[in-house]
Amino acid sequence: SGQTSSFRPDEKIMTSAYWTKDKKEGLHIPVARKALNRILQKSLGIERDEKGLLLSLSEVQELRAAAGGLYDESATIDENDAFPKSLLLAEAILKSALNRKESRGAHTRSDYPDEQESYRKTTVAVYKNGGIHISLAAIEGDPDGH
């Protein structure tokens, strides 16, 4: 399409999510949650492209790796429980968006501007064996069987 992506890695967002206290490195959940919000806002808007989605997926995976097994003593039990799940969900959404190589409804892929009949299906994300797997499934009740 000749367009270049406006997405760039944001080192400030990523590094501000980390903190050091008493020589114990960890993730500060309130700051990391803001970083996650910024990452998703820049790539999951109405107009998207592969480059921006891949960059955001990489940043979410980096946050997810950093959050694995860590406990933020300044956050609540619920925040410590919910944040890794939010990262997993964010990864599933980004992988789903990457898998759909078309524009449909309100979401436009600048690198795939046309609607594709083969994508007239629902996206299914499954967490299995430590990874997220994306597939397409027929829409129940679709008379054309797509």
State the predicted function of each range.
Residues 1-146:
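Glycine- and aromatic-enriched mobile tails/lids
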